[in-house]
Amino acid sequence: MALLWGLLALILSCLSSLCSAQFSPVSTMEPLDLQLMDGQAQQKLPPLSLLKLDNQEPGGQIAPKKAPEDCKLSPTPEQTRRLARAMMTFTTDLFSLVAQSSTRPNLILSPLSVALALSHLALGAQNQTLQRLKEVLHADSGPCLPHLLSRLCQDLGPGAFRLAARMYLQKGFPIKEDFLEQSEQLFGAKPMSLTGMKGEDLANINRWVKEATEGKIEDFLSDLPDDTVLLLLNAIHFQGFWRSKFDPNLTQRGAFHLDEQFTVPVDMMQALTYPLHWFLLEQPEIQVAHFPFKNNMSFVVLMPTRFEWNASQVLANLTWDILHQPSLSERPTKVQLPKLHLKYQLDLVATLSQLGLQELFQAPDLRGISDERLVVSSVQHQSALELSEAGVQAAAATSTAMSRMSLSSFIVNRPFLFFILEDSTSLPLFVGSVRNPNPGAQPERKEQQDSPDGKDSFQDHKGLPRGDKPFDPDLKLGPPSEEDYAQPSSPK
């Protein structure tokens, strides 16, 4: 089972010297009950955003442009593919920068949550600010981007995802009605008033976060700027059960190789004949395997065969087309996968600036949100992952395949990257890297004979079933044909 949750925050604050002397009450501020949606009722989450007013002179009053009627239509297959490709490119851009600056051994973040936040902001962005947002998201869908992303998310993993959103506003803050309407329609974010009492507001916000993440994130905010005028919150909760569960009785302590010299002990989930589809990339040589969940999702492992790698190198040439392999068949495989418990929190201001969004934190044009001059002052993100044995028994057809002899092995006992992908579109929901799944343990020097040589996770190429080749023209090692499987003998 994989249990994931994510929260993103943008905050709008108002500089007291530039704000209107007195905001008049806004009647649209109504308390919003917790919205946790699953199945067809689920809605999108906007990340928690913190924005504040800067010292620019107010510009002309520009209402947010209403999206064309075409935006309200269901996305075409081609639009869905283009959006999924764009999201994968954004994901690799974002995670490469985060990995470069992080000193933590394990990372996890939700590019979907970040993209939802930026597309939410795009509802009120104008001119160059809007253009930069679309460029960073690699979006070519024009004004329909928030609508397409919203519709795509509503169709994700029925029963596995719960999405929640909330918006907090300072009483009387002059926000555009169109922005409020579209925020609720596309992201499920209704406005709720801040009381003006910091302690009470913090308690209310953190209580909502705790409920939306089922108690996994507590005390997300420790302070609230005195001049806060707007908070946009979203929470993503994903619970994925393995389509073929791991037997807890087979889980045992194993060695995870940190590098050529040291290992740490870790609980390894195991299966002798696990239905897996995998392939091998070269230059650099990377083993890729899709572990299927129910609800059309997969945990995708990318494991370089050498220790000397960084995320930027691995992701440099990784595209949507490489990971999207719907034609690959599953094969029974000997599998070892470490149990994981990851949590990571970071401020994304520097990373988003490096991606080209410096203007958001200096002088953005957000007059589609309010005629007041706003600037993004903080973007906080937190994600976590728990990986364990629980799953749902495979269907009869899969059980038959699993009864055949395993022809290969996929042993995840060295540093790796991972994605949580939606299978039909390969839309990335979460991305992360694991260099040490047990950072609290004392590394142990390993014996020479225990050192993996970079090939152990697959059988040596000489041992591949007949008909298989180490590399085919598109640099992928596909599963063998049906005739390569050992067939059970007929009972006499």
Curated annotation (Swiss-Prot):
GO molecular function list: serine-type endopeptidase inhibitor activity
Glycosylation positions in this chain: 127, 249, 296, 310, 317
Residues with site note (Reactive bond for plasmin): 404-405
Originating species: Bos taurus (Bovine)
PTM: Proteolytically cleaved at Pro-31 by both the prolyl endopeptidase FAP form and antiplasmin-cleaving enzyme FAP soluble form to generate mature alpha-2-antiplasmin.
Family (UniProt): Belongs to the serpin family.
Gene3D superfamilies per the UniProt record, alphabetical: Alpha-1-antitrypsin, domain 1, Antithrombin, subunit I, domain 2
Listed name of the protein: Alpha-2-antiplasmin
Record-annotated site: Cleavage: 40-41
Record's keyword terms, sorted: Acute phase, Disulfide bond, Glycoprotein, Protease inhibitor, Secreted, Serine protease inhibitor, Signal, Sulfation
The UniProt record lists the keyword Disulfide bond: yes
Signal sequence segment: 1-22
Disulfide bond residue pairs: 71-144
UniProt xrefs under Pfam families: Serpin (PF00079)
Site (described: Reactive bond for chymotrypsin): 405-406
Role this protein plays: Serine protease inhibitor. The major targets of this inhibitor are plasmin and trypsin, but it also inactivates matriptase-3/TMPRSS7 and chymotrypsin.
Binding partners and assembly: Forms protease inhibiting heterodimer with TMPRSS7.
GO cellular component: extracellular space
Propeptide segment residues: 23-40
InterPro entries: Alpha2AP_serpin_dom, Serpin_CS, Serpin_dom, Serpin_fam, Serpin_sf, Serpin_sf_1, Serpin_sf_2
Biased composition (Basic and acidic residues): 443-475
Record PROSITE patterns: SERPIN (PS00284)
Tissue-level expression: Expressed by the liver and secreted in plasma.
Modified sites of kind Sulfotyrosine: 485
Location(s) in or outside the cell: Secreted
